[in-house]
Swiss-Prot record:
It is a multi-pass membrane protein. GO terms for biological process: pantothenate import across plasma membrane. May function as sodium-coupled metabolite transporter across the chloroplast envelope. It is found in: Membrane; Plastid, Chloroplast envelope. The gene is BASS1. Disulfide bonds: none annotated. Gene3D superfamilies: 1.20.1530.20. This is Probable sodium/metabolite cotransporter BASS1, chloroplastic.
Length: 406
């Protein structure tokens, strides 16, 4: 009896396995086999046939997955967009690294600009008042892009920090100016100028330095606005009590200037960050460069306009101004930490107290004091607090605040 031969079995095919976490299609046909071992784990796309749809790992959107088993990237759907996205990310990372280097070298750029302005004033005399407003406004816009509307609301809910900074602004600096002028026995015109600048509100440059020093930018903006609004009353009052001469201030002019260069750009930046985040992510790497360049140019311009007076004023007035701002930075931080304010906000208060609106002091001294040398301490102040602030920004930027242990 002949042996019965079993008919050849049909090629076995492994059925499709549906796993809740992973969809893989396997077959013994090597032409259609998917190879996954060499692909990135975080972004995986499996292409098993030219006629079958592209599958992806469950939970990972296919729009984010550009890796494939096919060795020819040009044949992978979406591969071109992936290369373009990678190129954009690469350039953005490069700009971020350059901006970080510029930010860490902030003191060097400011000091260099001041030295050049003192040596060759015409190099910085081209800066017009309108250019100053535009430069500061763009910088404030960049800082506003780091905020959200919720950040500004949170700052408004910080009465302790806001009140402490306001009180330190109008107590530490005026008293320091008065005591230093007495201690160094300054001439009357230098003493009046030193007291005048110590009674001025916080300067808009403090917001830039706070931004670079990783401080609380929203709190800085509110402190600058609050001290500026109060300057219409407190600056002439404190100056008249400590310097013996009344100084008139235009409150509406202060309000308009503050709104133009601080409040409006910051609010616009926060709105852009809230509703146009894609645009913000695109331009944000350029903002550190704009901030550093703006401060350096404005400081150089302040020195260039008063170079002859600064050179002829001697060491005494320079020393007095340096002591004034050093006391503001030091006591602003130490007293804030003493009363239990967090590190980031203490940095902000220190910068706000130590940095004054020196330009306002120059204008008031030139308009309301008979001796033009009264404006010299104010001009020196614009350089001194910028150098101090830039040094602190460089140090604090490399030391991110850690308030978790408080």
């Amino acid at each position: 009896m002949p042996l019965l031969r079993r008919p050849p079995a049909a090629p076995h095919r492994t059925p499709i396995h549906h796993d809740k976490r992973l969809h893989l299609f396997s077959t013994h046909n090597t032409r259609h086999r998917a190879t996954v071992s060499s692909l990135p784990v975080t972004c995986l796309r499996i292409r098993y046939s030219s006629s079958n749809p592209v599958r992806h790992l469950c939970g990972i959107p296919s729009s984010r997955c550009h890796a494939a088993a096919d060795p020819a990237p040009s044949k992978i759907p979406g591969g071109g967009s992936g290369a373009l996205e990678a190129g954009v990310v690469g350039w953005r990372d490069l700009l971020l690294q350059v901006g970080e280097v510029l930010s860490l070298g902030f003191p060097v750029w400011v000091a260099s600009a001041c030295a050049v302005a003192l040596w060759r004033p015409p190099a910085f005399l081209w800066v017009s008042p309108m250019a100053q407003i535009v430069g500061i406004s763009f910088t404030m816009l960049g800082m506003g892009m780091t905020l959200t509307l919720d950040d500004l609301k949170t700052a408004l809910l910080m009465p302790k920090e806001l009140a402490s900074g306001f009180l330190l602004q109008y107590s530490v600096m005026p008293l320091s100016g008065f005591l230093i002028s007495k201690l160094l026995n300054l001439p009357s015109y230098y003493a009046a100028g030193l007291i005048l600048v110590s009674c001025c509100p916080g300067g808009t440059a403090s917001n830039i330095v706070t931004y670079l020093a990783r401080g609380n930018v929203a709190l800085s903006v509110l402190m600058t606005a609050a001290s500026t609004f109060a300057a219409a009353f407190l600056t002439p009052l404190l100056t008249s009590k400590l310097a013996g001469q009344y100084v008139a201030v235009d409150p509406m002019g202060l309000f308009v200037s503050t709104s133009q260069v601080v409040l409006a750009p910051v609010l616009l930046g926060a709105l852009l960050n809230q509703y146009c985040n894609g645009l913000v992510q695109l331009v944000s790497p350029l903002m550190p460069f704009i901030a550093v360049a703006t401060v350096a140019v404005l400081c150089g311009n302040a020195i260039a306009q008063n170079a002859s007076a600064i050179l002829s004023s001697g060491l005494q007035v320079v020393m007095s101004v340096c002591w004034l701002h050093a006391s503001g930075f030091f006591f602003g931080y130490v007293l804030s930490r003493t009363i239990g304010i967090d590190i980031s906000s203490s940095r902000t208060i220190s910068i706000e107290v130590g940095m004054q609106n020196s330009v306002l002091g120059v204008v008031l001294a030139s308009k309301h004091f008979g001796n033009p040398l009264t404006a010299v301490p104010c001009a020196v102040s614009s350089v001194c607090h910028s150098v101090y602030g830039s040094l602190l920004a460089g140090i604090w930027r490399s030391l991110p605040p850690n308030d978790k242990g408080q």
